[in-house]
């Protein structure tokens, strides 16, 4: 048994059965290969950008960008690449008054065939690799200021990449939807049909996974009304079409909705929703505290929120799925807060716990217990957060 198979077996053994079934050996092993692939791409991109030579001696991100004539906005993406390569032992870093200084320790990683190994195990994980490759192809345009991340990754010609990426057939993404569905199934009341509001529903893969999960248990009648919402019309229409086609009997209302604005002012009645659901959405709220307070406003007393998220096990830890998103403005240009959101991107369990407590939620739970798992498996970062609005308040 090779080391990745052994790692997969030990990790899965640490999960309770209803969670374990969402983390197949294929998923765990392909995730590790994708992590290697992302690290290797980051190293190759530094070479292509001519930035590797700038770190033969210690330098800050800003110094290296300025010497090469690259735009300042690339600092976030470059800092992540350097942090990831540092964590993997290829760079070293030191903190100084002028900021972190990085220096190359050993040659950047060579191509290990990680993509090919992952695809040999399960070809359905291809979309994750394709998105990274697409970004890498245009990375010089981004660093030079000729294109934004949105222009590279979200042009109309590339939307199909994202339909494939966020699809439940994508081995490396579907776990977010399946785990979220498990958490919602546990949180939904069993005494009455519920009104569910999904935020940032995208093309519908999270809603489909949830309704499939409820259908298996014979609990589709638990949904009294499902608000499927999404701010981007193209995704909204696609998601609504998929949901109506597969679950025509579910009471569905699809509407454009922006979590960064008042939900009540957009037509969601105060204290009308039993459960607010979102998958990999809330972490990109422009003002996290404001968005959570807006969500609380529409949740019934005693109602729940379930957020299936990438969860950063420890502060500052570079997570490979961030690589592509660090090039997108709505991911990085957010309101920060030292307690609940010290930086852009994914939050730690402690950040989520503090953010939800501050905004009037209690009974915080995390499925699975990422904090405990991270002691032995530091690269485990998928979790479903559940919290409730107190019954009296």
What does each model-identified segment do?
Residues 289-304:
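A short glycine-rich, Lys/Arg-flanked "PGG" loop and its adjoining helix->strand segment in the class I
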Residues 1-195, 213, 217, 221, ...:
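N-terminal accessory segments
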Residues 193, 223, 272-274:
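Local beta-strand N-terminus motif with an aromatic residue
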Residues 308-359, 363-369:
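C-terminal alpha-helical "lid/dimerization" subdomain adjacent to the S-adenosyl-L-methionine
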Residues 273-289:
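A short SAM/SAH-binding and catalytic strip from SAM-dependent methyltransferases
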Residues 263-276:
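A short acidic, Gly/Pro-enriched loop at the edge of an enzyme's catalytic core
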Residues 195-197, 201-264:
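Class I SAM-dependent methyltransferase SAM/SAH-binding core
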